[in-house]
From Swiss-Prot:
One of its GO terms (cellular component) is extrinsic component of endoplasmic reticulum membrane. It is a peripheral membrane protein. It comes from Bos taurus (Bovine). The modification N-acetylalanine is found at residue 2. The gene is EMC2. It is found in: Endoplasmic reticulum membrane. Belongs to the EMC2 family. TPR repeats lie at residues 87-120, 155-188, 192-225. This is ER membrane protein complex subunit 2.
Protein backbone atom coordinates (compact mmCIF):
# COMPACT_ATOMS: atom_id res chain seq x y z
CA UNK A 1 0.00 0.00 0.00
CA UNK A 2 1.36 3.40 -1.02
CA UNK A 3 2.39 5.76 1.73
CA UNK A 4 0.27 8.86 2.31
CA UNK A 5 3.35 11.08 1.99
CA UNK A 6 4.17 9.60 -1.43
CA UNK A 7 0.60 9.35 -2.67
CA UNK A 8 -0.21 13.00 -1.95
CA UNK A 9 3.34 14.38 -2.08
CA UNK A 10 3.20 15.85 1.43
CA UNK A 11 5.88 16.25 4.08
CA UNK A 12 5.69 14.81 7.58
CA UNK A 13 5.24 18.37 8.90
CA UNK A 14 2.17 18.82 6.70
CA UNK A 15 0.79 15.51 7.91
CA UNK A 16 1.39 16.55 11.54
CA UNK A 17 -0.36 19.88 10.91
CA UNK A 18 -3.31 18.09 9.28
CA UNK A 19 -3.67 15.88 12.36
CA UNK A 20 -3.65 19.00 14.55
CA UNK A 21 -6.32 20.63 12.37
CA UNK A 22 -8.54 17.57 12.65
CA UNK A 23 -8.15 17.62 16.46
CA UNK A 24 -9.06 21.30 16.65
CA UNK A 25 -12.11 20.75 14.45
CA UNK A 26 -13.08 17.64 16.43
CA UNK A 27 -13.39 15.79 13.10
CA UNK A 28 -14.55 12.18 13.13
CA UNK A 29 -12.94 11.19 9.84
CA UNK A 30 -11.52 8.04 11.39
CA UNK A 31 -10.25 6.39 8.19
CA UNK A 32 -8.16 9.41 7.21
CA UNK A 33 -6.83 9.86 10.75
CA UNK A 34 -5.76 6.22 10.82
CA UNK A 35 -4.06 6.44 7.41
CA UNK A 36 -2.14 9.64 8.16
CA UNK A 37 -1.54 8.92 11.85
CA UNK A 38 -0.28 5.37 11.37
CA UNK A 39 2.38 6.58 8.94
CA UNK A 40 3.37 9.43 11.25
CA UNK A 41 3.89 7.23 14.31
CA UNK A 42 5.63 4.43 12.40
CA UNK A 43 7.91 6.54 10.19
CA UNK A 44 8.38 9.87 11.96
CA UNK A 45 7.88 9.24 15.70
CA UNK A 46 11.37 10.52 16.55
CA UNK A 47 10.69 13.83 14.79
CA UNK A 48 7.34 14.59 16.43
CA UNK A 49 8.65 15.52 19.89
CA UNK A 50 5.93 15.80 22.53
CA UNK A 51 3.27 15.88 19.79
CA UNK A 52 3.67 12.12 19.54
CA UNK A 53 1.58 11.51 22.69
CA UNK A 54 -1.51 13.43 21.61
CA UNK A 55 -1.19 11.81 18.17
CA UNK A 56 -1.09 8.35 19.79
CA UNK A 57 -4.32 9.20 21.59
CA UNK A 58 -5.93 10.63 18.45
CA UNK A 59 -4.96 7.61 16.36
CA UNK A 60 -6.10 5.18 19.04
CA UNK A 61 -9.61 6.63 19.24
CA UNK A 62 -9.88 6.70 15.43
CA UNK A 63 -8.58 3.11 15.22
CA UNK A 64 -11.30 1.93 17.63
CA UNK A 65 -13.90 3.68 15.48
CA UNK A 66 -12.41 2.18 12.30
CA UNK A 67 -12.12 -1.38 13.65
CA UNK A 68 -8.31 -1.44 13.86
CA UNK A 69 -7.87 -2.94 17.31
CA UNK A 70 -4.26 -3.89 16.54
CA UNK A 71 -3.34 -0.25 15.97
CA UNK A 72 -5.44 0.92 18.94
CA UNK A 73 -3.65 -1.55 21.24
CA UNK A 74 -0.22 -0.47 19.98
CA UNK A 75 -1.00 3.21 20.69
CA UNK A 76 -2.45 2.35 24.10
CA UNK A 77 0.65 0.37 25.09
CA UNK A 78 2.92 3.28 24.13
CA UNK A 79 0.81 5.66 26.22
CA UNK A 80 0.81 3.27 29.20
CA UNK A 81 4.60 3.07 29.10
CA UNK A 82 4.92 6.84 29.08
CA UNK A 83 2.10 7.65 31.54
CA UNK A 84 1.64 4.72 33.96
CA UNK A 85 -1.29 5.29 36.30
CA UNK A 86 -2.72 8.17 34.24
CA UNK A 87 -6.52 8.47 34.51
CA UNK A 88 -6.61 9.70 30.93
CA UNK A 89 -4.87 6.54 29.72
CA UNK A 90 -7.13 4.40 31.92
CA UNK A 91 -10.13 6.04 30.26
CA UNK A 92 -8.70 5.08 26.87
CA UNK A 93 -8.40 1.51 28.14
CA UNK A 94 -12.08 1.69 29.08
CA UNK A 95 -12.96 2.93 25.60
CA UNK A 96 -11.18 -0.10 24.14
CA UNK A 97 -13.25 -2.34 26.44
CA UNK A 98 -16.35 -0.59 25.09
CA UNK A 99 -15.30 -1.22 21.49
CA UNK A 100 -14.89 -4.91 22.40
CA UNK A 101 -18.36 -4.81 24.07
CA UNK A 102 -16.77 -5.63 27.44
CA UNK A 103 -19.11 -3.15 29.08
CA UNK A 104 -18.87 -4.52 32.63
CA UNK A 105 -15.07 -4.27 32.55
CA UNK A 106 -15.30 -0.72 31.23
CA UNK A 107 -17.76 0.36 33.94
CA UNK A 108 -15.60 -1.18 36.69
CA UNK A 109 -12.60 0.71 35.35
CA UNK A 110 -14.51 4.01 35.21
CA UNK A 111 -15.80 3.42 38.74
CA UNK A 112 -12.21 2.99 39.97
CA UNK A 113 -11.23 6.23 38.26
CA UNK A 114 -14.14 8.02 39.93
CA UNK A 115 -13.23 6.62 43.35
CA UNK A 116 -9.80 8.19 42.95
CA UNK A 117 -11.12 11.38 41.31
CA UNK A 118 -14.87 12.07 41.76
CA UNK A 119 -14.59 15.18 39.55
CA UNK A 120 -13.46 13.21 36.48
CA UNK A 121 -16.19 14.24 34.05
CA UNK A 122 -14.83 12.16 31.16
CA UNK A 123 -15.20 8.90 33.11
CA UNK A 124 -18.74 9.81 34.15
CA UNK A 125 -19.69 10.56 30.55
CA UNK A 126 -18.24 7.27 29.34
CA UNK A 127 -20.42 5.42 31.87
CA UNK A 128 -23.47 7.25 30.54
CA UNK A 129 -22.48 6.38 26.96
CA UNK A 130 -22.33 2.70 27.94
CA UNK A 131 -25.81 2.79 29.48
CA UNK A 132 -27.12 4.30 26.24
CA UNK A 133 -25.28 1.73 24.10
CA UNK A 134 -26.89 -1.02 26.19
CA UNK A 135 -30.33 0.55 25.73
CA UNK A 136 -30.56 1.20 29.48
CA UNK A 137 -32.06 4.68 29.17
CA UNK A 138 -33.46 4.77 32.71
CA UNK A 139 -29.99 4.13 34.17
CA UNK A 140 -28.45 6.66 31.77
CA UNK A 141 -31.00 9.25 32.94
CA UNK A 142 -30.18 8.53 36.58
CA UNK A 143 -26.43 8.85 35.91
CA UNK A 144 -26.93 12.10 33.99
CA UNK A 145 -29.05 13.63 36.74
CA UNK A 146 -26.38 12.75 39.31
CA UNK A 147 -23.75 14.25 37.03
CA UNK A 148 -25.71 17.49 36.55
CA UNK A 149 -26.10 17.90 40.31
CA UNK A 150 -22.34 18.46 40.38
CA UNK A 151 -21.80 20.04 36.95
CA UNK A 152 -24.93 22.10 36.39
CA UNK A 153 -23.32 24.22 33.68
CA UNK A 154 -22.63 21.35 31.28
CA UNK A 155 -24.87 22.26 28.34
CA UNK A 156 -24.05 19.12 26.37
CA UNK A 157 -25.25 17.00 29.30
CA UNK A 158 -28.52 18.96 29.57
CA UNK A 159 -29.18 18.38 25.88
CA UNK A 160 -28.34 14.69 26.15
CA UNK A 161 -30.72 14.39 29.09
CA UNK A 162 -33.47 16.14 27.11
CA UNK A 163 -33.00 13.65 24.26
CA UNK A 164 -33.21 10.71 26.66
CA UNK A 165 -36.42 12.04 28.20
CA UNK A 166 -37.88 12.50 24.71
CA UNK A 167 -37.01 8.88 23.89
CA UNK A 168 -38.80 7.84 27.08
CA UNK A 169 -41.81 10.08 26.19
CA UNK A 170 -41.32 12.10 29.38
CA UNK A 171 -41.97 15.40 27.64
CA UNK A 172 -42.43 17.54 30.76
CA UNK A 173 -38.91 16.72 31.97
CA UNK A 174 -37.51 17.11 28.45
CA UNK A 175 -39.07 20.59 28.32
CA UNK A 176 -37.43 21.47 31.65
CA UNK A 177 -33.99 20.47 30.30
CA UNK A 178 -34.52 22.56 27.18
CA UNK A 179 -35.64 25.53 29.29
CA UNK A 180 -32.32 25.29 31.14
CA UNK A 181 -30.51 25.37 27.81
CA UNK A 182 -32.50 28.34 26.51
CA UNK A 183 -31.72 30.35 29.63
CA UNK A 184 -27.99 30.05 28.96
CA UNK A 185 -28.31 30.08 25.14
CA UNK A 186 -31.19 32.45 24.34
CA UNK A 187 -30.02 32.95 20.74
CA UNK A 188 -29.77 29.27 19.82
CA UNK A 189 -32.59 28.71 17.31
CA UNK A 190 -32.29 24.92 17.48
CA UNK A 191 -33.04 24.84 21.22
CA UNK A 192 -36.10 27.05 20.64
CA UNK A 193 -37.24 24.77 17.83
CA UNK A 194 -36.80 21.60 19.87
CA UNK A 195 -38.59 23.12 22.86
CA UNK A 196 -41.46 24.09 20.54
CA UNK A 197 -41.62 20.52 19.20
CA UNK A 198 -41.81 19.11 22.72
CA UNK A 199 -44.64 21.49 23.70
CA UNK A 200 -46.45 20.66 20.45
CA UNK A 201 -46.18 16.94 21.25
CA UNK A 202 -47.56 17.52 24.75
CA UNK A 203 -50.68 19.02 23.22
CA UNK A 204 -53.44 21.08 24.80
CA UNK A 205 -54.20 24.72 24.01
CA UNK A 206 -51.68 26.22 26.44
CA UNK A 207 -48.84 24.02 25.18
CA UNK A 208 -49.79 24.69 21.56
CA UNK A 209 -49.62 28.44 22.16
CA UNK A 210 -46.17 28.05 23.73
CA UNK A 211 -45.19 25.85 20.81
CA UNK A 212 -46.24 28.48 18.27
CA UNK A 213 -44.42 31.19 20.23
CA UNK A 214 -41.12 29.28 20.25
CA UNK A 215 -41.39 28.18 16.63
CA UNK A 216 -41.77 31.88 15.84
CA UNK A 217 -38.75 32.70 18.04
CA UNK A 218 -36.68 30.05 16.25
CA UNK A 219 -37.64 31.65 12.94
CA UNK A 220 -36.76 35.10 14.24
CA UNK A 221 -33.29 33.81 15.18
CA UNK A 222 -32.88 31.94 11.89
CA UNK A 223 -35.34 32.75 9.12
CA UNK A 224 -34.06 29.79 7.07
CA UNK A 225 -35.16 27.21 9.63
CA UNK A 226 -37.74 25.35 7.54
CA UNK A 227 -38.56 22.92 10.33
CA UNK A 228 -39.55 25.84 12.55
CA UNK A 229 -41.62 27.29 9.69
CA UNK A 230 -43.53 24.04 9.28
CA UNK A 231 -43.90 23.89 13.06
CA UNK A 232 -45.36 27.39 13.11
CA UNK A 233 -47.88 26.35 10.46
CA UNK A 234 -48.85 23.17 12.31
CA UNK A 235 -49.16 24.73 15.77
CA UNK A 236 -51.11 27.76 14.52
CA UNK A 237 -53.43 25.51 12.49
CA UNK A 238 -54.18 23.34 15.51
CA UNK A 239 -54.88 26.37 17.70
CA UNK A 240 -57.19 27.78 15.00
CA UNK A 241 -59.23 24.55 15.05
CA UNK A 242 -59.20 24.09 18.83
CA UNK A 243 -62.74 24.33 20.27
CA UNK A 244 -61.39 25.87 23.49
CA UNK A 245 -59.79 28.81 21.67
CA UNK A 246 -61.64 32.13 21.53
CA UNK A 247 -62.90 33.52 18.23
CA UNK A 248 -60.13 36.15 18.20
CA UNK A 249 -57.46 33.54 18.96
CA UNK A 250 -58.75 31.36 16.13
CA UNK A 251 -58.75 34.29 13.71
CA UNK A 252 -55.23 35.38 14.69
CA UNK A 253 -53.83 31.88 14.37
CA UNK A 254 -55.49 31.39 11.01
CA UNK A 255 -53.48 34.41 9.85
CA UNK A 256 -50.27 32.98 11.32
CA UNK A 257 -50.88 29.62 9.64
CA UNK A 258 -51.70 31.29 6.32
CA UNK A 259 -48.52 33.37 6.50
CA UNK A 260 -46.40 30.30 7.34
CA UNK A 261 -47.91 28.30 4.46
CA UNK A 262 -47.24 31.13 2.02
CA UNK A 263 -43.61 31.36 3.21
CA UNK A 264 -43.19 27.61 2.76
CA UNK A 265 -44.65 27.94 -0.73
CA UNK A 266 -42.19 30.72 -1.59
CA UNK A 267 -39.28 28.67 -0.27
CA UNK A 268 -40.14 25.73 -2.51
CA UNK A 269 -40.68 27.99 -5.50
CA UNK A 270 -37.26 29.53 -4.89
CA UNK A 271 -35.74 26.04 -4.81
CA UNK A 272 -36.99 25.59 -8.38
CA UNK A 273 -40.03 24.00 -9.98
CA UNK A 274 -37.99 21.81 -12.32
CA UNK A 275 -37.34 19.10 -9.76
CA UNK A 276 -39.97 16.39 -9.55
CA UNK A 277 -39.89 16.19 -5.74
CA UNK A 278 -40.21 19.98 -5.51
CA UNK A 279 -43.41 19.86 -7.58
CA UNK A 280 -44.91 17.33 -5.18
CA UNK A 281 -43.87 19.53 -2.23
CA UNK A 282 -45.43 22.59 -3.87
CA UNK A 283 -48.68 20.68 -4.39
CA UNK A 284 -48.71 19.81 -0.68
CA UNK A 285 -48.23 23.47 0.27
CA UNK A 286 -50.93 24.58 -2.19
CA UNK A 287 -53.28 22.06 -0.57
CA UNK A 288 -52.41 23.65 2.80
CA UNK A 289 -53.39 27.07 1.52
CA UNK A 290 -56.60 25.73 -0.01
CA UNK A 291 -57.54 24.11 3.30
CA UNK A 292 -56.98 27.42 5.09
CA UNK A 293 -59.19 29.25 2.59
CA UNK A 294 -61.97 26.67 3.03
CA UNK A 295 -61.74 26.99 6.82
CA UNK A 296 -61.88 30.78 6.61
CA UNK A 297 -64.88 30.88 4.27
Amino acid sequence: MAKVSELYDVTWEEMRDKMRKWREENSRNSEQIVEVGEELISEYASKLGDDIWIIYEQVMIAALDYGRDDLALFCLQELRRQFPGSHRVKRLTGMRFEAMERYDDAIQLYDRILQEDPTNTAARKRKIAIRKAQGKNVEAIRELNEYLEQFVGDQEAWHELAELYINEHDYAKAAFCLEELMMTNPYNHLYCQQYAEVKYTQGGLENLELSRKYFAQALKLNNRNMRALFGLYMSASHIASNPKASAKTKKDNMKYASWAASQINKAYQFAGRSKKETKYSLKAVEDMLETLQITQS
